[in-house]
Amino acid sequence: MPNIFKILLIVLLAVVSFRLSASTGDKKTANDGSGNNSSAGIGTKIKRIVTAGLLFTSLATGGAEAIGRSNAQGGNAAGLVPSHVTNRSMAPPPPPVQFEMGANRLEKMRAHLRELAEKMPVNESKRLSPSGPDPHHH
């Protein structure tokens, strides 16, 4: 059972990180002179968090257990040492606030992606260009 959870989580994170990297595409180096490239910074931050999550989740031996303890980014969270061996006093510190924010943002994005997937009919699963006209209207 934990393996199924682990695989699902990895796939989900991969999808989210792919969507993120696609959405920030050419904005990474864009700078209009007034230093307004902060959006790229936020995107890369989230991407880093996602990548770290992917890395630790794929390394974790007890994936679901590590997720349940929500310390997938802590010191020994890679699951290389089983939790029953680890000393309780060596528990990793609570995650920083920034990670919490990133997690919340990811949750929102996942919910949004789920809604989009539900709304999209099967026969229109081909990608439409976001700004282009809808082919069915012409």
UniProtKB/Swiss-Prot annotation:
Residues 23-90 are annotated as: Required for secretion from the host cytoplasm to the host apoplasm. It is found in: Secreted; Host cytoplasm; Host extracellular space; Secreted, Extracellular space, Apoplast. Glycans are attached at N37, N87, N123. Keywords: Apoplast, Differentiation, Glycoprotein, Host cytoplasm, Secreted, Signal. GO terms for biological process: cell differentiation. One of its GO terms (cellular component) is extracellular region. Highly expressed exclusively within the dorsal esophageal gland cell during syncytium formation in host plants (at protein level). Residues 66-97, 116-138 are annotated as: Disordered. A motif (CLE) lies at residues 127-138. Its main location: secreted. Residues 1-22 form the signal peptide. Belongs to the CLV3/ESR signal peptide family. Mimics host plant CLE extracellular signal peptides that regulate cell fate. May play a role in the differentiation or division of feeding cells (syncytia) induced in plant roots during infection. This is CLAVATA3/ESR (CLE)-related protein 2. It comes from Heterodera glycines (Soybean cyst nematode worm).
